[in-house]
Amino acid sequence: MPPQLSNGLNHSAKVVRGTLDSLPQAVRDFVESSAKLCQPDQIHICDGSEEENQQLLSHMEEEGVIKRLKKYDNCWLALTDPRDVARIESKTVIITQEQRDAVPIPRSGLSQLGRWMSPEDFEKAFNARFPGCMKGRTMYVIPFSMGPLGSPLSKIGIELTDSPYVVASMRIMTRMGSAVLDALGAGEFIKGLHSVGCPLPLKKPLVNNWACNPELTLIAHLPDRREIISFGSGYGGNSLLGKKCFALRMASRLAKEEGWLAEHMLILGVTNPEGQKKYFAAAFPSACGKTNLAMMNPTLPGWKVECVGDDIAWMKFDQQGNLRAINPENGFFGVAPGTSVKTNPNAIKTIQSNTIFTNVAETSDGGVYWEGIDQPLAPGIKLTSWKGTEWDPKDGEPCAHPNSRFCTPASQCPIIDPAWEAPEGVPIEGIIFGGRRPAGVPLVYEALSWQHGVFVGAAMRSEATAAAEHKGKVIMHDPFAMRPFFGYNFGKYLAHWLSMAQHPAAKLPKIFHVNWFRKDKDGRFLWPGFGENCRVLAWMFDRVQGKGGARLTPIGYVPEEAALDLRGLEAIRVSELFQVSKEFWEEEADEIHKYLEEQVNADLPYEIQSEVLALKQRISQM
């Protein structure tokens, strides 16, 4: 007779590691009801130990899911099914009773600010996917903490998954294991249920031994029930539920209810030559150099940059009115292509050990390779592409997928900030918005006020390469770099940001906007970027201290020429870098106005509407 789970359900899942008795009652109920539904063969309660990790990695190696990279210490390569390589916005939904709780209702067409699904439609979708979806597989129970264990800003989640790749990655990206269950006790937690959607025996063979079910992929967030439910994809952004699903979509909704902010932002510490230190948070859309800025090697003598986090910030005002931030993650899930000793030497040092690479190319001597790695291959070394075939540059295809990743422990970063795990967080004195803007937008400007700064975040736009090559490059709206990650109505999100100014004793950070990517008429970058960006950080540092010369323009304060330290740089065309053209900004303001009126519509806060009109007025007087 099969063993019975203690709730009397006749279910044959065998607990192969840990015991159900050791789980807090609410966690046990979640595990048992999910096991009854998904019908795994085995249940494995993760303890997070090194021994467990090595066992899982060896098991995946035997199954052909990952390959050991012999050139490095404890590094692994996973190649996915080519249909499962990225987040899928069209299949990522928020479920609420009322559509308007999840997304603003646009004037016409579809909302670009998130996707809503009704509870009724979700129930049908859920019932068509999850019953029996883990047959023949092991259900892993992953207790994890977003943020340092015991920090008042941290939150706990329990993810159930049938993917050992998810377990190994979550051990890097979060604090995971028995200590989390001890800290949880009878406390609240976010529930995550994930399945690759490939019960055994398989109906059709896997590609690259990578389990996924692209036809039925769905990533659903139920904020009222504190649940995340993901089916059909093994890719990180869809399966590591602590990342975007919890840390941004779910957390932004919790933050709204509890009076804090969950943001798509890096956190860095900047120390000047006098030894004074200030922390900044920065929001850039993807492919704008967040990780590179977070791990920068400054070129200015005497300045130091240290990294608290490269992707997500949870921020809350303390009793003294300081905006305190933690990085809720424990690792970096970085885009590999473009990462090199030149662009990001600290990332290259971080990923030499204990790292899981996904969809990069492999060298014949057991190393990794990608576009922009800037290291010539040694004679006789061949490349295997991310598709698992020998790579030839004549094929005209990249050797690594453009969204290929490294998943690596933050503690290995040579410039990790000494306070990166401080339970109280670090005090944020400046917030930076930015995007990739080839024309019209200055290198840096400072917002006129908190309210104007919130408008600057709402107006963020960035160049994205259109999927269809013939379209060329388009400038996309990406407010707060959160467009794919809002957990609730963006109009209400703006009101929440504006409300921070009402916080008693709030020391509101200064808000800045940067653009490293302005080009001249011949298409050449006007600014060298990378380590030279410390010169812009130095000006912001001075501004936060009440120093640093600035002149007023219709869009905000830009540095006076003498205030930006350009020593040692070749012929920088300062006037071109900081030019604010009436013609460009008339068009820009019209486009922003149109977007906010159409997309946010009735939920646009009055204060943001008045900022648009004030900007138009200032431009008209140029």
From Swiss-Prot:
Localisation: Cytoplasm, Cytosol; Endoplasmic reticulum
Cofactor note: Binds 1 Mn(2+) ion per subunit.
Active site: 288
PTM annotation, UniProt: Acetylated. Lysine acetylation by p300/EP300 is increased on high glucose conditions and promotes ubiquitination by UBR5, acetylation is enhanced in the presence of BAG6. Deacetylated by SIRT2. Deacetylated by SIRT1.
Catalytic activity annotation: oxaloacetate + GTP = phosphoenolpyruvate + GDP + CO2; L-seryl-[protein] + GTP = O-phospho-L-seryl-[protein] + GDP + H(+)
EC number(s) per entry: 4.1.1.32, 2.7.11.-
Region (Omega-loop) residue spans: 457-487
Major subcellular location class: cytoplasm
Keyword annotations of the record: Acetylation, Cytoplasm, Decarboxylase, Endoplasmic reticulum, Gluconeogenesis, GTP-binding, Kinase, Lyase, Manganese, Metal-binding, Nucleotide-binding, Phosphoprotein, Transferase, Ubl conjugation
Modified residues annotated as N6-acetyllysine in this record: 70-71, 91, 473, 521, 594
Signal peptide interval: none
Binding of substrate, residues: 87, 235-237, 286, 403-405
Similarity comment: Belongs to the phosphoenolpyruvate carboxykinase [GTP] family.
NCBIfam families named among the record's database cross-references: PRK04210.1
UniProt miscellaneous comment: In eukaryotes there are two isozymes: a cytoplasmic one and a mitochondrial one.
Domain notes: Binds oxysterols in a pocket within their transmembrane domains and interacts with SCAP via transmembrane domains 3 and 4. The KxHxx motif mediates association with the coatomer complex.
Full protein name: Phosphoenolpyruvate carboxykinase, cytosolic [GTP]
Organism the protein comes from: Sus scrofa (Pig)
